[in-house]
Each structure stands twice: as structure tokens, then as C-alpha cells.
Amino acid sequence: MNSVPSLPGQSVAAVVVAGGKGLRTGGPVPKQFVIWRGKPLLRHCVEALEAAGIAPIVVAIPAGWDEAATQALAGISMVRLVHGGATRQESVKAALEVLEGDAPARVLIHDAARPDLPGSVIERLLTALDKRTGAIPVLPVVDSMVRGSGDAMGETVAREDLYRVQTPQAFHYPAILAAHRAWQGEALAGDDAQVAMRAAHEIALVEGDEALRKVTFASDLEEQSMSVIPRTGMGFDVHRLVEGEELWLCGVNIPHGKGLSGHSDADVAIHALVDALLGAIAAGDIGDHFPPSDPQWKGASSDRFLAHAGTLVTEAGYRIANVDVTIICEAPKIGPHKAAMRETLARILGIDSALVSVKATTTERLGLTGRGEGIAAQAVATVVSG
């Protein structure tokens, strides 16, 4: 995602509203912390804002859920947490006041329950702020509309002037902060545009996106997950153990009397994982992209191969949902290094370590790995669209 358009001095911050209990999804955990597509729902929208170059990002969370929020957003810089209030409006006001010392020119206010956030919507909103105090994304109403009284149909309502309102909503920061402070609470504010309108600010309408669908019920999580198309690839590799070489496994240097022999650094685990990722998107194998006959790859770090495979996955329109690597050897012991291996693979691929599994097994002293002549590895990678 490209950085958001801005003029010199026109800094852009964001508020993410995650202060509700969100229990209508049917579970014991607020929906913003529910794992969806491999990550907490909250993390999806915060990462989208971060990728757009927006900072700082203030997240309003429910009291008592600090640890869950910290874990959900681990590794994301420029994020601040604040406890939300009894209403959405109170939560937004508290978050806006956290930004007062930064004095951003503009601010986006977004619901954590809308995990898919296209960068194009952000761009349209901020462009609209050149002419108006606020801007909101909307979509047309396509169904017929009627008023009702209980189970009885009333008058028909013309849909031509009706819109479905989404978030994020964009505002000049000083104006929306003042509007929230002036809000008297005589009625619950449905969104921040209502607060701004009450303060006599003009709000622009920009084109929204169906991807910004709000997650409210458990069925919403299921329906959005069904739109994801998974693909799976497998990889396998083996290298001989020799004297005088360093041993690299999953990007981690392992102290051992021998190392693996190969054209690159012979990281057998990464090689298997690269093939699994390439297989998932039907992009050939590691030899197609990094032929051993090419001298430029002699002694090369296998990190480069894995990073390239990850880039190809993204360029093909997919994202990594899970990778699982099994290292097959009698020695060295893999257990003490598993955590470092997971973190290293996650860092290279730019994904959460929760999506990375590293295991080890032996062949009960059978075959070349059992005799200590080599190390093998197999990997499975799942990628999903959307």
C-alpha cells in the first residue's frame, strides 16, 4: 500500500475504536481479539493503517483487556492504548485527547470491526479533506426501503438519497476534537460524522468499498472467511553433513561439529519452505529461481531465497496463512533453537510468528539422516487470497 497523500505539515494520525465488549459474535472474547485469517481482528486494520504511513495510531480498548491488546498488536510501532468509555463517543473522545500533544492536522477514526481496509478509501477520504472538514465513505442502498411498525409494512422510502455509511471517517483533527468535547450526550452518537454535523461542520461523501464490511455476528466471521481461497504447497530437501561448514537451519546458526554442504549456505529447512511457498502459488521450485549453476548464489544466505518467495506470494495476490517446517535429523537437538527459528522465519517473511511452526523428528537411526550423514526437511505452506 502506498503512503497516504498529504501536504507539507499535514500530518495524519488515526484512532481505532475497539472499546466495546463485542460479544455478539458468540464467544467469551471481545470480537476485536478473535483470531481471523491468522491474526486478531484488531491487528488487521491497525496494520493497514500502519502500511499507509499513518502514525501515531491510538487504539481505544475495553478496561481489563490490556494484555490481550498488547499481544494482538505486538511488534507494531507507534501504537498507543487508551481505555474506552461507556459509549463509542466517549471512547473516541478519550483517544482523540491522547493525540492532543501530537497535534496532527488530520485524523482517521476507524472501527476495529472492519478488518479489511483498502488504501484507496484512505486516499479518497484525505483528498476530500482539502475542501471539507470531514469525509466519510459511503455505498449506495440497492434494496427497496420501507418503514415498518412491528411486523406491519408502512410507507415506502425513496432509496436514491440514502447511503450505507462506513469507516474510517476522516476529519481535521482540531475540529473533531472540539466537536467531541462539545457533545452533550443528549443522544447516542451513531458515528463521528454525526458529532461533527452537530457542531455545524460540512461532511463530504466519498466512495466506500464493499471490503469494509463490518463484523458483528459470528456468521459475519464465517462468511468473510469463506471468501478466502486457500492454496497449499509442499517442499522437501536434503543436504549432506560435512566437516568444515557452518550449520544453518531456519536462518539460525547452530553450533555443531559439521555443517551442510550445498551451493548456497545449504539451509535445508529454508529450502524446503521456499519450495512449499512456490508450490502453493504454482511458481516452480527453488532451482528455477536460484539455479545452482549460477555462481552468484554460491555461499548465499538462504534468507534471500525465502524473502523472494514471500514477495512472489504477495505479488500473486495471496498472503501467508501458515507455514509448517519439520527438520529430520539425529543431531543436533532442535528443541533449544525452535523459538529462534520461528522468530527468524517470521521476520524474513514479514508475518506473525504465530503463523510459523517448526518441529523436529528422527528416522530412528534409519537411512542417511539416521546414520548422521545428512539432514532433511519437509515443509507445508498455506496461502490465501484476499
Curated annotation (Swiss-Prot):
Gene Ontology biological-process entries: isopentenyl diphosphate biosynthetic process, methylerythritol 4-phosphate pathway; terpenoid biosynthetic process
Swiss-Prot/TrEMBL catalytic activity: 2-C-methyl-D-erythritol 4-phosphate + CTP + H(+) = 4-CDP-2-C-methyl-D-erythritol + diphosphate; 4-CDP-2-C-methyl-D-erythritol 2-phosphate = 2-C-methyl-D-erythritol 2,4-cyclic diphosphate + CMP
Record-marked site positions (Positions MEP for the nucleophilic attack): R159, K214
Binding positions (4-CDP-2-C-methyl-D-erythritol 2-phosphate): D237, V238, H239, H263, S264, D285, I286, G287, T361, T362, T363, E364, R371
Listed cofactors: a divalent metal cation
Pathway(s) per entry: Isoprenoid biosynthesis; isopentenyl diphosphate biosynthesis via DXP pathway; isopentenyl diphosphate from 1-deoxy-D-xylulose 5-phosphate: step 2/6; Isoprenoid biosynthesis; isopentenyl diphosphate biosynthesis via DXP pathway; isopentenyl diphosphate from 1-deoxy-D-xylulose 5-phosphate: step 4/6
Residues annotated for a divalent metal cation binding in this entry: D237, H239, H271
Source taxonomy: Bacteria, Pseudomonadati, Pseudomonadota, Alphaproteobacteria, Sphingomonadales
Entries under Pfam families matching the protein: IspD (PF01128), YgbB (PF02542)
Residues annotated as signal peptide: none
Keyword Phosphoprotein in annotation: no
Function: Bifunctional enzyme that catalyzes the formation of 4-diphosphocytidyl-2-C-methyl-D-erythritol from CTP and 2-C-methyl-D-erythritol 4-phosphate (MEP) (IspD), and catalyzes the conversion of 4-diphosphocytidyl-2-C-methyl-D-erythritol 2-phosphate (CDP-ME2P) to 2-C-methyl-D-erythritol 2,4-cyclodiphosphate (ME-CPP) with a corresponding release of cytidine 5-monophosphate (CMP) (IspF).
Gene for this chain: ispDF
Protein name listed in UniProt: Bifunctional enzyme IspD/IspF
